[in-house]
Amino acid sequence: MAREKFERNKPHVNIGTIGHVDHGKTTLTAAITNVLAKKGQAQAQDYGDIDGAPEERERGITINTAHVEYETDGRHYAHVDCPGHADYVKNMITGAAQMDGAIIVVAATDGAMAQTKEHILLAKQVGVPSLVVALNKCDMVDDAEMIELVEMEIRELLSSYDFPGDDIPVIQVSALKALEGDSEWEGKIDELMKSVDESIPEPEREVDKPFLMAVEDVFSITGRGTVATGRIERGKIKVGEEVEIVGIKDTRVTTVTGVEMFRKLLDEGMAGDNVGLLLRGVQKEDIERGMVLVKKGSITPHTKFEGEVYVLKKEEGGRHTPFFAGYRPQFYIRTTDVTGQITAFTADDGSNVEMVMPGDRIKMTGELICPVAIEQGMRFAIREGGRTIGAGVVSKIIK
């Protein structure tokens, strides 16, 4: 059977369900597909289809993730749901499933629980820009005041993590009833998706951002000069444009005199393209893997940052023993390893942590031996002797 062509007639947005275990994330995901399937906008999936999520590997870490897709009248969505709490933590930190927004599922019977808070904090740290609340299991709560209290509590919780708690939509749903075909609750799923359409903004396309390409390899071509190759992460580049070479050594400016892809000359390269850029007046020894080529003035190199980190368990190929402040691993950033030191660890409540165990999620302060192009929201791996022992995301640039 011929594969269906992906029709790009609607804007595409990536979302996911987050929240405490057993509050109904997977049931809600199934309910959304079933309600939209009745309008021909999704393929109906049941709980078991989504719950038996396949394992994936991202940056050397195994994560179970279910992907479903569906449409509303105005958009095409890719929706990610994870079976286990640890999968969420790993997913959000590695950026395996980049989310432009998330539906946070809270059971009206329980209110916000430990993982609700942890997922909201993580959403803040890893840069999930917008949230919508699905207050689930509302069919099981007879008292309207009780539901109102839970809603107030969640709004306060969101505000305490610097989300706009007063403005975020909170929709009362019963995922199970909607899945069973109860028309009143099916209507609530429509209402939820309308909120997602309206309050999760369309992401800025990578192509519209300032140009950035991480250098993977460098060649010199006799008579023509030096070529840097890599995948364009964002923006676009034309022949004749000036770029800066940033990281490891002092920043310098050069002009792109040629853009090649698959040995053919291009007028311009854009986000997602694997290209070779011919650079004017640059020697092969001036540029190396791990540097980035960027639009002039768009990025500065840094050495000190805070990161939200997941430390791999022994079974995941991580360390067998704990480590302490002062630990000196390699930080794998974009295309290269940079030696650095972890100077401090902090718990969620801001207190200092002495020791970090395999399997922990922790906030750390890292300092690199040479400046590289790091940015808030950027992913990195922590490695030791070539194997990955942790994954992180930059939550703040210090210096």
Swiss-Prot record:
GO terms for cellular component: cytosol. GTP binds at residues 19-26, 81-85, 136-139. Residues 60-64 are annotated as: G2. Pfam families: GTP_EFTU, GTP_EFTU_D2, GTP_EFTU_D3. It comes from the Bacteria. Residues 174-176 are annotated as: G5. Residues 81-84 are annotated as: G3. Its EC number is 3.6.5.3. Mg(2+) binds at T26. GTP hydrolase that promotes the GTP-dependent binding of aminoacyl-tRNA to the A-site of ribosomes during protein biosynthesis. PANTHER family: ELONGATION FACTOR TU, MITOCHONDRIAL (PTHR43721:SF22), ELONGATION FACTOR TU-RELATED (PTHR43721). This is Elongation factor Tu. The gene is tuf.
